[in-house]
Amino acid sequence: MKFLVLAVLLTVGAAQEGISSRALWQFRSMIKCAIPGSHPLMDFNNYGCYCGLGGSGTPVDELDRCCETHDNCYRDAKNLDSCKFLVDNPYTESYSYSCSNTEITCNSKNNACEAFICNCDRNAAICFSKAPYNKEHKNLDTKKYC
């Protein structure tokens, strides 16, 4: 399952599986911290092979690799003993963080699972902020290119 939460996961996915959208909303807010003026739902959902719901193939660019890395980070979170109570779903874990200018800091009071997931989201948001955005990869035909 592609990790990048944005549209589908914030609405349909969260409603269908009883997932707390708060944790997903935090990731959206982190992206907005790292990239002021961005619209994560519109900008990153359905970008490349990994940004959005699902993910497969070879990432098409640096931004898409950020999404693949985030997917893999959430996969790793599922395997952590400290995250087992989440019913193998890192999307349900909310955490504490702060944003100052474009600097994101995960709160040291987060438990081990919260800290891990917070850092997954933090690293992805920072990665997004540094990666070029290629409009031709938005709404990419994944069956053809991934």
UniProtKB/Swiss-Prot annotation:
Lipidation, N6-palmitoyl lysine type: K78
Keyword field contains DNA-binding: no
UniProt signal peptide: 1-15
GO biological process, one term: positive regulation of interleukin-8 production
Keyword list, A-Z: Autocatalytic cleavage, Calcium, Disulfide bond, Hydrolase, Lipid metabolism, Lipoprotein, Metal-binding, Palmitate, Phospholipid metabolism, Pyrrolidone carboxylic acid, Secreted, Signal, Zymogen
Cofactor binding comment, as recorded: Binds 1 Ca(2+) ion per subunit.
PROSITE patterns, alphabetized: PA2_ASP (PS00119), PA2_HIS (PS00118)
SUPFAM superfamilies, per the entry: Phospholipase A2, PLA2
CDD domains reported for this sequence: PLA2c
UniProt cross-references to Gene3D superfamilies, sorted A to Z: Phospholipase A2 domain
One Pfam family named in its UniProt record: Phospholip_A2_1
Residues at the active site: H70, D121
Gene Ontology CC: one annotated term: extracellular region
Entry binding sites for Ca(2+): Y50, G52, G54, D71
Record text on activity regulation: Regulated by bile acid salts. Up-regulated by cholate and down-regulated by taurochenodeoxycholate.
Prodomain positions: 16-22
Entry-linked InterPro entries: PLipase_A2 (IPR001211), PLipase_A2_Asp_AS (IPR033112), PLipase_A2_dom (IPR016090), PLipase_A2_dom_sf (IPR036444), PLipase_A2_His_AS (IPR033113)
Cystine bridges: C33-C99, C49-C146, C51-C67, C66-C127, C73-C120, C83-C113, C106-C118
GO MF annotation: an example: phospholipid binding
EC number of this enzyme: 3.1.1.4
Record bears the keyword Hydrolase: yes
Function summary: Secretory calcium-dependent phospholipase A2 that primarily targets dietary phospholipids in the intestinal tract. Hydrolyzes the ester bond of the fatty acyl group attached at sn-2 position of phospholipids (phospholipase A2 activity) with preference for phosphatidylethanolamines and phosphatidylglycerols over phosphatidylcholines. May play a role in the biosynthesis of N-acyl ethanolamines that regulate energy metabolism and inflammation in the intestinal tract.
Record text on subunit structure and interactions: Monomer or homodimer.
Further details from the record: Loss of activity upon alkylation of His-70 with p-bromo phenacyl bromide; Ca(2+) and Ba(2+) protect against inactivation.
Full protein name: Phospholipase A2, major isoenzyme
Protein's organism: Sus scrofa (Pig)
Gene it is expressed from: PLA2G1B
